[in-house]
């Protein structure tokens, strides 16, 4: 297969003044000081219809509540949760339980079964434990059903099903009398010495706060609750019930980019409602070579993950193991070696801007070369910096807009006006649709308790929400002062990049080690010291403020908390050294063996 590449762009063809003015113009169109207030929560009040229930069997209401005493409770049975469980088993800990809201393993991949769903980083670095399971992904970018199959393969290999309680939705977790008590809405109660929240970053869907959203009479759902009863077909089969219908898709982020080609192949007509165009790079997906695993040496997956990390952050590498389109010259400048960077901050910022103008111009040139209609062509061009949005990669998305049955409805940055019983209104004009799909994403930077929809109460009756009122406070991005024996696998203040599986792999290894050592040594309580947590947060804030300065001219989106670049957002940023440095820091911490920064009580 011939590899696609982005068009070349000469630096001499770039007009920095024009681009600065254009970026600012597009940003100002989209500014909304309300931030999350412009979104509505799935399942709130009149939006109960958007709550996903069709993947839950009616067994939770009929079964008897369970009461369990155990050493460890893990909340969440997605990749993060089962990775934590595997680490416990590898450390000889077998007395644990997993508590999961859904009716199966999978987490994000259990709920997000929309057509076209795929991982958007390489399967070989996204799907964990490939060496341990001997599994080889069939494609460079695996599709949802295959990923779900792999998750269940892990659960089977480590015999996790007997230790997992499905359809058990946590309502509260309280620290009392040296134990955590976890209660569910089904009346269950789990008492444990240690608690791990592993609910992942894409758990709480959001809908646009559009007037009339509940008045629509046709089938409508959020992408994370795709209803195949309404559409027909499956994640891999044609959507037969859409064949005579006009389908509206609101949103043009990573989910819509994956979904549109599949829906366009099934529906009579598709209307795509766009606030901000996505930056769509080439993907070059294809089958895994037959001899892929033949020459791999032990430790290959971690090396490949680290190679991606370095490519993404622009660190020097000997060779690119990951043939990866995530490579960005802008990020190389931002994270490269000190000898490569101007020492003056103003000069560095200018260099970043010049470099990024060229990177994004290549994305826009791809639109020029792909889209036939001149108006649609201009509307699909992203006018912002690389750092502003999660990059998208697809080989068919842009081509869809050349199809006669696909029409872009650009809102010029304003979003839709309102929704009626059979239409979406943009700039006063009604656009009739038979079904409406919201690809409007998730709350990404909210806290663990809000993500999960349950309260976490630590010592002295203080909730995590109260403790994190100024923003997250952690040590290593994993533990919280005042919350003994509590661990959270999350993105805030941890080593994170677009491959969340690296964060989950690294964090679960650390959590498994700490719990195992504490159980072995008879530790009653373990938590970070206030000083260790304060020092970690100070470091995060310093890096976070720098990142927010670079994002100040971005259009609103989840990467910049919808334009709310305040101190609270800075505390939600990531370990500034990058994910590989975070892993090495934790490895050195374990090797040292003195539990630096953690206070252990016997």
Swiss-Prot record:
Recorded hits in SUPFAM superfamilies, A to Z, give: FAD/NAD(P)-binding domain (SSF51905)
Listed GO MF terms: monooxygenase activity
Which Gene3D superfamilies does the record associate with it? FAD/NAD(P)-binding domain
* Gene name as annotated: hpm7
Q: What does this protein do?
A: FAD-binding monooxygenase; part of the gene cluster that mediates the biosynthesis of hypothemycin, a resorcylic acid lactone (RAL) that irreversibly inhibits a subset of protein kinases with a conserved cysteine in the ATP binding site such as human ERK2. The first step is performed by both PKSs hmp3 and hmp8 and leads to the production of 7',8'-dehydrozearalenol (DHZ). The highly reducing PKS hpm8 synthesizes the reduced hexaketide (7S,11S,2E,8E)-7,11-dihydroxy-dodeca-2,8-dienoate, which is transferred downstream to the non-reducing PKS hpm3.
Task: Return the EC number.
Answer: 1.14.13.-
| Cofactor binding annotation | Binds 1 FAD per subunit.
Key word Calcium present:
no
What is this protein called in UniProt? FAD-binding monooxygenase hmp7
Metabolic or biological pathway? Secondary metabolite biosynthesis
Tell me which UniProt keywords the record has, alphabetically. FAD, Flavoprotein, Monooxygenase, NADP, Oxidoreductase
Protein family (similarity comment) = Belongs to the FAD-binding monooxygenase family.
- Which domain of life does this protein belong to? Eukaryota
Record note on biotechnological use: Hypothemycin is an antifungal agent that exhibits excellent activity against Peronophythora litchii, which could be helpful for the storage of harvest litchi fruit. Hypothemycin is a strong inhibitor of a subset of MAP kinases such as human ERK2. It can therefore be used as an anti-cancer drug thanks to its inhibitory activity of Ras-mediated cellular signals. It can also inhibit Trypanosoma brucei kinase TbCLK1 which is a good candidate as a therapeutic target for African trypanosomiasis. Finally, hypothemycin also has inhibitor activity of T cell activation.
Q: What's a Pfam family this protein contains?
A: Pyr_redox_3
EC primary class: oxidoreductase
Q: Where is this site: Transition state stabilizer?
A: 390
Q: What are the binding positions for FAD in this chain?
A: 108-111, 120-121, 126
Flavoprotein as UniProt keyword: yes
The organism of origin for this protein: Hypomyces subiculosus (Nectria subiculosa)
- Kindly list the positions annotated as binding NADP(+): 118-120, 252-258, 275-276
Cofactor(s) annotated in UniProt = FAD
């Amino acid at each position: 297969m011939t590899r696609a590449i982005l068009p070349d762009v000469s630096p001499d063809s770039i007009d920095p003044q024009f681009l600065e003015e254009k970026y600012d113009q597009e940003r100002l169109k989209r500014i909304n000081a309300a931030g999350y207030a412009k979104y509505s929560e799935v399942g709130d009040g009149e939006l109960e219809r958007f709550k996903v229930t069709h993947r839950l069997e009616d067994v939770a209401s009929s079964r008897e509540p369970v009461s369990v005493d155990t050493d460890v409770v893990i909340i969440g049975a997605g990749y993060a949760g089962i990775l934590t469980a595997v680490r416990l088993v590898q450390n000889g800990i077998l007395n644990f339980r997993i508590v999961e809201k859904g009716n199966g393993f999978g987490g994000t991949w259990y709920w997000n079964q929309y057509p076209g769903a795929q991982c958007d980083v390489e399967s070989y670095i996204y799907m964990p434990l490939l060496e341990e399971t001997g599994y080889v992904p069939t494609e460079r970018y695996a599709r949802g059903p295959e990923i779900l199959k792999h998750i269940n393969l892990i659960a089977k290999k480590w015999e996790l099903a007997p230790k997992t309680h499905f359809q058990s939705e946590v309502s509260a977790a309280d620290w009392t009398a040296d134990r955590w008590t976890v209660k569910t809405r089904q009346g269950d109660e789990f008492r444990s010495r240690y608690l791990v929240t592993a609910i992942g970053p894409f758990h709480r869907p959001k809908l646009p706060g559009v007037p009339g959203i509940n008045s629509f009479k046709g089938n409508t759902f959020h992408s994370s609750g795709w209803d195949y009863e309404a559409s027909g077909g499956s994640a891999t089969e044609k959507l037969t019930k859409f064949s005579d219908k006009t389908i509206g898709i609101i949103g043009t982020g990573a989910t819509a980019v994956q979904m549109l080609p599949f829906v366009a192949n099934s529906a009579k007509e598709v209307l795509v409602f766009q606030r901000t165009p996505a930056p769509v790079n080439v993907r070059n997906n294809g089958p895994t070579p037959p001899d892929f695993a033949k020459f791999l040496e032990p430790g290959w997956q971690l090396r490949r993950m680290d190679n991606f990390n370095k490519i993404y952050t622009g660190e020097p590498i000997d060779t690119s193991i990951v043939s990866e389109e995530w490579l960005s010259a802008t990020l190389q400048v931002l994270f490269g070696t000190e000898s490569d960077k101007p020492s003056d901050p103003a000069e560095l910022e200018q260099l970043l801007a010049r470099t990024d103008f060229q990177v994004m111009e290549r994305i826009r040139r791809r639109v020029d070369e792909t889209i036939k209609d001149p108006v649609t062509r201009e509307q699909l061009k992203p006018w912002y910096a690389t750092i502003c949005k999660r990059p998208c990669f697809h080989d068919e998305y842009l081509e869809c807009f050349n199809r006669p049955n696909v029409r872009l409805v650009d809102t010029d940055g304003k979003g839709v006006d309102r929704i009626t019983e059979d239409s979406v209104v943009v700039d006063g004009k009604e656009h009739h649709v038979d079904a409406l799909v919201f690809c409007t994403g998730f709350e990404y930077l909210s806290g663990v308790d809000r993500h999960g929809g349950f309260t976490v109460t630590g010592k002295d009756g203080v909730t995590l929400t109260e403790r994190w009122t100024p923003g997250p406070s952690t040590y290593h991005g994993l533990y919280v002062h005042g919350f003994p024996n509590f661990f959270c696998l999350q993105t805030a203040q941890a080593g994170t990049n677009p491959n969340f599986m690296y964060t989950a792999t690294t964090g679960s290894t650390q959590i498994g080690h700490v719990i195992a050592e504490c159980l072995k040594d008879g530790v009653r309580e373990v938590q970070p010291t206030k000083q260790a947590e304060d020092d970690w947060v100070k470091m995060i804030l310093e890096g976070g403020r720098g990142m927010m300065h670079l994002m100040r001219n971005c259009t609103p989106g989840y990467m910049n908390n919808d334009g709310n670049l305040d101190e609270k957002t800075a505390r939600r940023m990531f370990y500034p050294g990058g994910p590989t440095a975070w892993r090495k820091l934790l490895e050195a911490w374990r090797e040292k063996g003195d539990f630096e920064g953690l206070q252990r009580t016997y």
